UniProtKB/Swiss-Prot annotation:
Catalyzes the condensation of ATP and 5-phosphoribose 1-diphosphate to form N'-(5'-phosphoribosyl)-ATP (PR-ATP). Has a crucial role in the pathway because the rate of histidine biosynthesis seems to be controlled primarily by regulation of HisG enzymatic activity. SUPFAM superfamilies: Periplasmic binding protein-like II. It is an enzyme of class 2 (transferase). It is found in: Cytoplasm. InterPro entries: ATP-PRT_HisG_long, ATP_PRibTrfase_cat, ATP_PRibTrfase_CS, ATP_PRibTrfase_HisG. Keywords: Amino-acid biosynthesis, ATP-binding, Cytoplasm, Glycosyltransferase, Histidine biosynthesis, Magnesium, Metal-binding, Nucleotide-binding, Transferase. It comes from the Bacteria. Belongs to the ATP phosphoribosyltransferase family. Long subfamily. This is ATP phosphoribosyltransferase. It comes from Afipia carboxidovorans (strain ATCC 49405 / DSM 1227 / KCTC 32145 / OM5) (Oligotropha carboxidovorans). Feedback inhibited by histidine. Pathway: Amino-acid biosynthesis; L-histidine biosynthesis; L-histidine from 5-phospho-alpha-D-ribose 1-diphosphate: step 1/9.
Length: 325
């Protein structure tokens, strides 16, 4: 029996909803044939694919171990969980959801502390004054150590946080924190501020590939099909389709259209009296339509694109280069 291709997807909440919607837009419908509470699923129409519904943190761990081929998880968890991440996994595509910034935040009462250099001064004076190191509450232990080392800060110790990290300074459990934030509102509500240069990582949900997975020829072909769907949808999302008939259309006009509007003619110059098809960025639709009518078009129709399939599969080409022969 062929070993299944395993795609790991977040098991609950907005991440799962967004992941399901992302694959659905790409024409890949995730299904749970044995019921909504099952933690295994399939992709409709793709044989030998197993969907593993896991927590985002467990997905990162299983990618590291090679137990899944592809997975959706946050870059913050990839960088925190996987040592030498760029050698062991590949961030194939940012998915446009699950945004979070990993930041260094200190009490607002520290009015003279605005940068990591200021924090270094505080760390040194804190140890002299209190005969102990200042405490940093976080669940991002590895990211914190790396970032603080880059800034030459050594006089601190990490207090591991399981949750509600932003409350640690107020409770006396730590002097400052490293945590995720989107708007900064929760930090402010807890009397904290982000340092001016305290942005450690801008994270979002990513489609990630594991180098250590069993990449048989069958697994690579499955990945090719999945990534072709995703790339086709991504191409379509960038353009609208413009169709018209022109009394005269030549290569010079198409070059002008591409140069001024970023619009492409995927099928080239039409024959005399034929329909010209263009793919145009949405922001340039009206100016392009104005030009086409000025050049003799009686009607210009504009429609949405579901998928734009091309011979190229850039996502899979990058994966192949990462995996090697």
């Amino acid at each position: 029996m062929t070993t299944p291709f395993v795609l790991a997807v977040p098991s609950k909440g907005r991440l799962q909803e967004n992941a399901d919607a992302f694959f659905g837009r790409a024409g890949l419908t995730l299904a749970k044939p044995r019921g909504a509470r099952d933690y295994r699923g399939t992709i409709t129409g793709l044989d030998n694919v197993e969907i593993a519904y896991l927590s985002a943190s467990e997905i990162a761990a299983q990618l590291a171990r090679g137990q899944v081929h592809l997975g959706i998880t946050g870059e913050d968890l990839v960088r925190e969980t996987i040592a030498d991440a760029d050698k062991r996994v590949m961030l194939i595509e940012g998915l446009g959801f699950g945004y979070a910034n990993v930041v260094v935040a200190v009490p607002q009462a520290w009015i003279d502390v605005r940068t990591m250099a200021d924090l270094d001064d505080v760390a040194t004076s804190f140890r002299v004054k209190h005969n102990r190191r200042m405490r940093v509450a976080t669940k991002y232990i590895n990211l914190t150590r790396h970032f603080f080392a880059l800034h030459g800060i050594v006089d601190y110790r990490i207090v591991e946080s399981a949750g509600a990290t932003e409350g640690a300074p107020a409770s006396g459990a730590a002097e400052l924190i490293v945590d995720i934030t989107t708007t900064g509102a929760t930090l402010a509500a807890n009397g904290l501020k982000m340092l001016d240069d305290g942005m450690m990582l801008r994270s979002q949900a990513n489609l990630v590939a594991s180098r250590a997975a069993d990449w048989t020829p069958e697994a690579r072909e499955t990945a090719r099909v999945i990534l072709d769907h995703i790339a086709s949808r991504a191409r379509a999302a960038k353009y609208k389709e413009v169709r018209t008939c022109l009394p005269g259309c030549d290569a010079a006009l198409l070059s002008e259209i591409e140069q001024h509007f970023g619009a492409l003619a995927p099928f080239g110059t039409p024959p005399a009296g034929g329909i010209l098809t263009l793919h145009c960025p949405p922001a340039q639709l009206y100016p392009l339509g104005t030009l086409l009518r000025a050049r003799g078009a009686e009607t210009v129709s504009i429609g949405s694109l579901d998928y734009v399939m091309a011979r190229d599969n850039p996502l899979f080409s990058r994966l192949e280069a990462f995996l090697g022969a």
